[in-house]
Amino acid sequence: MAHPLVFITGATGFLGSATAVAALKAGYRLRICVRKPSDELQNLLSGYSEQVEFVTVADWTAEGAFRGLLDGADYVIHLAHPIPSGPEKEYYFTPAVKATTALLREAARVPSIKKVVVTSSIAALMPLDGIPSGGVIKEDNDWDFDVDETEDFAASNDPRGIPMRLYHASKLLANQTAWEFRKTAKPPYALVTLHPAFVYGRNPVQTTAEAIQESSNGLLWHAIMTGVPHHSYSRVPGVHIDDVVEAHLRALDPAIPDGSKYLLAAKGGTWKEVADVIQRDYSYLGAKITPDIEEEFLSTDSSKAEAELGMRWRAWEQMVRDVVDQQLEFANV
C-alpha cells in the first residue's frame, strides 16, 4: 500500500524545509510545489528521491495556477507566504489571498484529498492595531480582525516596521480568505489552520551567516547582537521550529477535526531570559543584549494545542542556543 501523498508549498523556506524533512522521515510522499528550483532544498532532500517529486508554478496568483497538480494527493500543507521584505502592499496582499484561494479551490476538485492544513500565524489572531489591554492571544477571541486594504501603510512613524505591519495584515487577510472559503464553498476536505508565534531554531536551508536575515531567526539574532529588538512586534512571543513541525504532522491525524485552529507558542519567556543565556554561555560573542530589557512578551494561551495536538513546548533557552550555535558554525567558532 502506497504511503500518503502530501502536496506542500513553501518547502524552500525555513519552516517549510524542516516540515518537508520531518514528513519524509515519517514516511509520507511529497509533491513539492515551488516557484523556481532550489538547489538548497534539492540537496537537503537528496536522500529521499524516491519519495519526492517537484512541480513548478511561477505565478501562484493566476487563475487555475494549480490545475491538475493536486491530483492523487491525500493531504495539502500550505506553508508558502510572502516574507517581510518591502513596503509595497501588492507584494503581500495579492499572493496571500489569491494563492490561498486558488489552492483551496483546486483541492476541492480532488476527491482524494482528506485535509488541508494552512500555516497561518499568531498575527492572524492579533488585531492589526494591537490587542486590547490585558488581552490574551488565543484561537477564539471576539476581537476586530478587519483590515483596511486602502490604508497607506507607507505613512508610518516607524518606517522599519512597515514590512512587518504589511506581513501582519496579509496574514489576517489570508486567514480570513481560508475560513470564508470553507464557509461559502463547503469543500469536502477538512480545513485546519496553525498559528505559530515567531519561529526560532536551526534553519535547514540557511547556507551563510548573513542569510539569517531571510528568516524569523534574524529577529532574534538582531536583538541579541544589538541589544535592541528592532521592530514594533518585539513583544510577540516565540516557538521552537521543531514544535511547529510536529504540530503540522499531528494536524494530519484524522482525529483532528475539520474547522480546528491552533495557536503554537512557547510558554513564558522574556528578553531578560534571552540575555541571561547569552551572558552565561556566550560571553565571548560580543552581543549587546543585557538583562535590563524590561519588555515582556504578549500573553498567550496555547492550551488547545497542548490538549488536542499533544504539544509540549521546548524552552526559550533551546531556541536561543540553536540559533546562536548555527551562526557560530557558519563563523567556524
From Swiss-Prot:
Q: Indicate whether NADP appears among the record's keywords.
A: yes
What Enzyme Commission number(s) appear in the record? 1.-.-.-
Gene inactivation effect: Decreases overall sphingofungin levels.
Give the Gene Ontology MF terms in alphabetical order: oxidoreductase activity, acting on the CH-OH group of donors, NAD or NADP as acceptor
Q: Which residues cross the membrane?
A: none
Q: Supply the alphabetized keyword list.
A: NADP, Oxidoreductase
Q: What class of enzyme is it?
A: oxidoreductase
Glycoprotein as UniProt keyword: no
Instruction: Quote the record's binding site residues for NADP(+).
Output: Y167
Source taxon at top rank: Eukaryota
Application in biotech and industry reads:
The sphingofungins A, B, C, and D, show a limited antifungal spectrum of activity but are especially effective against Cryptococcus species, fungal pathogens causing opportunistic infections in human.
Induction profile: Expression is positively regulated by the sphingofungins biosynthesis cluster-specific transcription factor sphG.
Family to which this protein belongs = Belongs to the NAD(P)-dependent epimerase/dehydratase family. Dihydroflavonol-4-reductase subfamily.
Summarizing the function annotation, the protein's role is: Ketoreductase; part of the gene cluster that mediates the biosynthesis of sphingofungins, bioactive molecules acting as sphingolipid inhibitors via inhibiting serine palmitoyl transferase (SPT). Does not seem to be involved in any biosynthetic process leading to the production of sphingofungins, but might be connected to a regulation or resistance mechanism.
Task: List the protein's name.
Answer: Ketoreductase sphI
From which source organism is this entry?
Aspergillus fumigatus (strain CBS 144.89 / FGSC A1163 / CEA10)
